[in-house]
């Protein structure tokens, strides 16, 4: 009998969500029947598609909530669509389990409605929602914060086993979620090397500057892009250097606000916000960069989270500057310099240190590339995905 898995992701469409798409296509390539339910997004508007062996069901993206009532409506709208499409998928394709990808921590509710049909819930822990709430709103109190803790607890209570992105998340699954260690699989979001190809630099991107600093990622309120602007301002106006171009690649809800801030700081001639761009343009920018930065500030969320951008920089052989965060340091190790937490001036100094020592930067980049090739690429990390599902289905006699 076929092993059938339904993956539900609430906040991003596939194939755009790299981790979820890699999971889905890896399972499909290994003989599983895989379906995905996700929201629609820019460029991903078809309600049904069959891509690379994966059935994709999409629903309209709910309006982003604000406040208790707004969040409740947003989550209810998403859950209603997920349940509607799950019923459709169960009838058309079928599934033995629902693999829920947070945030938010509510997809177990959909799985509960199929429990009478023998469907189990598998949790894929992408973000620690209580810490995300604290980072976003600056407090770890109140009804909404307590609701995040309750939802996380219920998620682990109802899941058969879990995938987590790193050891910090595994510790949370055990200590806060009450999971057994053997039921928590560390599935790191390793990059696929065929997607991240090292290519010749394109000097014209630098706008006539000698050096370039690159950034790739979501442009949101929690990503700390303001630290990059402050670092660029410090280098230009305090160190009196005007030979560095900053290329910030990615889209997100904070993009226009940061473009406005950049212009107000009179940095728009040396800092470019590209917005969301095709993969080839992203590769052009990162391959041209001399140094790449990660501006995620120190907080409880970021300190425990693995950022995909770090591994992508490493895959392209780039030396990195980032703040001193636990999981960021585990990923990059000797491929990065570590600035004092939330200190834009120290970040700027670390950037200059690497730009003025290109041989050291080259060695760091080679170290990072080798670490990804030999340990952290999806080819290696995906073994945990297959191990977890193979054990699960064998226990079901499938």
Residue map of PLM features:
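Acidic anion/phosphate-binding donor-loop and adjacent secondary structure
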Residues: 174-175, 182-183, 190-206, 224, ...
């Amino acid at each position: 009998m076929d092993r059938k898995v339904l993956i539900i992701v609430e906040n991003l469409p596939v194939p755009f969500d790299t981790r979820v798409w890699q999971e889905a296509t890896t399972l499909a390539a290994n003989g599983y029947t895989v379906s995905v339910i996700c929201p629609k997004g820019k460029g991903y508007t078809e309600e049904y598609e069959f891509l690379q062996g994966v059935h994709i069901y999409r629903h309209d993206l709910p309006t982003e909530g604000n406040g208790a009532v707004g969040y409740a409506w947003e989550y209810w709208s998403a859950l209603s669509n997920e349940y509607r499409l799950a019923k459709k998928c169960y009838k058309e394709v079928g599934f033995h389990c629902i693999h829920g990808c947070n945030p938010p921590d509510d997809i177990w509710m959909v799985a509960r409605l199929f429990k009478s049909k023998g469907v189990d819930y598998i949790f894929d822990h992408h973000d620690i929602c209580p810490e995300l709430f604290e980072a976003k709103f600056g407090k770890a109190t109140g009804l909404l914060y307590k609701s995040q803790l309750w939802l996380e607890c219920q998620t682990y209570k109802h899941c058969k086993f879990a995938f987590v992105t790193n050891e910090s998340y595994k510790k949370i699954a055990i200590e806060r979620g009450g999971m057994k260690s053997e039921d928590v699989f560390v599935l790191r979001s390793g990059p696929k090397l065929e997607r991240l190809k090292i290519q010749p630099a394109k000097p014209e991107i630098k706008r006539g500057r000698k050096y370039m600093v690159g950034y790739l990622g979501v442009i949101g309120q929690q990503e700390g892009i303001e630290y990059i602007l402050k670092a660029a301002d410090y280098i230009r106006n305090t160190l009196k250097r005007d030979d560095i171009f900053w290329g910030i690649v990615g889209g997100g809800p904070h993009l226009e606000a940061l473009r406005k801030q950049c212009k107000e700081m009179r940095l728009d001639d040396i800092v470019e916000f590209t917005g969301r761009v095709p993969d080839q343009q992203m590769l052009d920018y990162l391959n041209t960069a001399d140094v790449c930065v990660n501006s995620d500030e120190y907080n409880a969320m970021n300190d425990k989270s693995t950022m995909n951008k770090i591994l992508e920089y490493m895959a392209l052989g780039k030396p990195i500057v980032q703040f001193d965060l636990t999981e960021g340091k585990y990923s990059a190790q000797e491929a990065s310099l570590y600035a004092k937490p939330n200190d834009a001036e120290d970040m700027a100094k670390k950037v200059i240190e690497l730009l003025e020592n290109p041989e050291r930067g080259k060695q760091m980049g080679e170290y990072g590339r080798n670490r990804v090739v030999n340990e952290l690429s999806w080819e290696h990390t995906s073994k945990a995905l297959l191990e977890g599902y193979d054990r699960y289905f064998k226990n079901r006699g499938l």
